[in-house]
Amino acid sequence: MGIGNSQPNSQEAQLCTLPEKAEQPTDDNTCQQNNVVPATVSEPDQASPAIQDAETQVESIVDKRKNKKGKTEYLVRWKGYDSEDDTWEPEQHLVNCEEYIHDFNRRHNERQKEGSLARASRASPSNARKQISRSTHSTLSKTNSKALVVGKDHESKSSQLLAASQKFRKNPAPSLANRKNMDLAKSGIKILVPKSPVKGRTSVDGFQGESPEKLDPVDQGAEDTVAPEVTAEKPTGALLGPGAERARMGSRPRIHPLVPQVSGPVTAAMATGLAVNGKGTSPFMDALAANGTVTIQTSVTGVTAGKRKFIDDRRDQPFDKRLRFSVRQTESAYRYRDIVVRKQDGFTHILLSTKSSENNSLNPEVMKEVQSALSTAAADDSKLVLLSAVGSVFCCGLDFIYFIRRLTDDRKRESTKMADAIRNFVNTFIQFKKPIIVAVNGPAIGLGASILPLCDVVWANEKAWFQTPYTTFGQSPDGCSTVMFPKIMGGASANEMLFSGRKLTAQEACGKGLVSQVFWPGTFTQEVMVRIKELASCNPVVLEESKALVRCNMKMELEQANERECEVLKKIWGSAQGMDSMLKYLQRKIDEF
């Protein structure tokens, strides 16, 4: 690209000079190729006759920039020339090329919008509000392109708008306090934030809990932080408010810590000494009545870590914290305290995530919530139910801490209440007409393992294991295990599990028929969801009738077995020997802890 060797004698000759490789035109239909207007031009703001006819020679506008004086220049692609001959032309030289300028500005804005959408799709939840500044910048750029009019006065206005846009883009993101005061409706950003079911609870580090000293990682997140799956969920069915749902399941809002801590250590004499006092209770029961309970690892040997820890111990595990937070935030149809219910396409997903007990153990409150969720799933359009758990433990059976705490008042009455709760809980599984699929992600102990044969399909993680150490607990079997275990694995293996508490690995449980299939831990969730969606695509009538045919001869037998087991449990728990065995078990847990 070069300039002719002869010096032009007029302004018109200078503006119409073409590249050397092209033949010198005889008319004045071309524009200059120099990057700047020659110094010999006396009136730079007045376009020459050749430039006024430049529309017939301009092919397209390729780019634009600001020169040192702050004026806009456009990179022009000339007809009949390639990209090497593109020239930067001042805006005032393109008076008759407004169509090309508007077309370039339109394409430029579309590219900016596409880039913003691509960045927004890759952004994390914490970066959602950064789209506010991008959206505002895009709005200013759009206004700038519309306000661009050829002329000196309009050029100065466009320069001011572009400068303001660049200044806004360079500013750092607003602080968290300022973000909350911004009007998101004006910026075009729509953020769906689910509200917490319990109001008036404090928020520390983005989580709501009972107190800053012991903060539960599973509690609801702050309302200004949203997981990516929130906008993807579409709630179906009737939405129940916090008060109505709480009244329906018989629970009350939790304001104070549920489990007070004993200030001093619990000695062996407190647990083993069963000499009753004037009230008919042991010193250990007096301590429980006075202080509430003690911090005890409630799972059997083999569960090395509970699902809940102090938040300081979880600082180095951000992924697990996000997972728990995400599960709590994406519940779409119903809200509970100890479980999470998600209404999916064709099925209902129930996750154990207990707040009132350790390691997803079962107490009457948890059982009532599971029964309520199953009743709702039985009445809506769900084809099946998926039962799983949050954390590394599936279920640790009965919550003995909850039970012993209430035995101090009236042993016989509390034993009856606990037995009735188990009876109703197990009968709900027996009488449920739709298929129940269980995804066992970790250890299943006691009642958590006994209910598995009452379900239809059981998929297990490779790391899961199964144990029913009823003699260690000081109680008799429950959950219809006295009938279903011998049917599934034979009398010898069933007795070994029920009497001596043999622990089965996932592969052993699959070989004995307790588990349908075992998956690798890394792909467990994906494998389960693929198969669940396949089942959910089937005809619901076929699924329900198929289960009825399989279970028709067992329903009455299971209900009678459940009744017998609960009567025996009531008898054992109401006796002094039963309480003695339970206290010894808890003492061993204290020593192990």
UniProtKB/Swiss-Prot annotation:
Gene null: resulting phenotype: Mice show no overt differences in body weight, but males display a substantial decrease in the size and weight of the testis and show reduced fertility. Males show decreased epididymal sperm counts, sperm cell motility, and sperm velocity and a marked increase in cell apoptosis in the testis.
EC number annotated for this UniProt entry: 4.2.1.-, 2.3.1.48
Zinc listed as a keyword: no
A Pfam family of this chain: ECH_1
One term of GO molecular function: crotonyl-CoA hydratase activity
Induction annotation: Down-regulated upon neuronal activity in the hippocampus. Up-regulated after social defeat stress.
Residue stretches of biased makeup (Polar residues): 1-14, 133-146
Residues with PTM Phosphoserine: S83, S165, S196, S211
Occurrences of domain Chromo (ranges): 56-116
Interaction with EZH2: region residues: 56-304
SMART domains: CHROMO
Residue segments, region Disordered: 1-30, 110-158, 200-223
Family annotation (InterPro entries): Chromo-like_dom_sf, Chromo/chromo_shadow_dom, Chromo_domain, Chromodomain_CS, ClpP/crotonase-like_dom_sf, ECH/Chromodomain_protein, Enoyl-CoA_hydra/iso, Enoyl-CoA_hydra_C
Gene Ontology biological-process entries: negative regulation of peptidyl-lysine crotonylation; random inactivation of X chromosome; spermatid development
UniProt modified residues of type N6,N6,N6-trimethyllysine: K130
PANTHER family: CHROMODOMAIN Y-LIKE PROTEIN, PTHR43684
Comment field on protein domains: The chromo domain recognizes and binds histone H3K9me3, histone H3K27me2 and histone H3K27me3.
Subunit structure: Forms multimers and multimerization is required for stable binding to chromatin. Interacts with HDAC1 and HDAC2 via its C-terminal acetyl-CoA-binding domain. Interacts with EZH2, EED, SUZ12, REST, EHMT1 and EHMT2. Part of a complex containing at least CDYL, REST, WIZ, SETB1, EHMT1 and EHMT2. Part of a complex containing at least CDYL, MIER1, MIER2, HDAC1 and HDAC2. Interacts with CHAF1A and CHAF1B; bridging the CAF-1 complex to the MCM2-7 (MCM) complex. Interacts with MCM3 and MCM5; bridging the CAF-1 complex to the MCM2-7 (MCM) complex.
Name listed for the protein in its UniProt record: Chromodomain Y-like protein
Gene: Cdyl
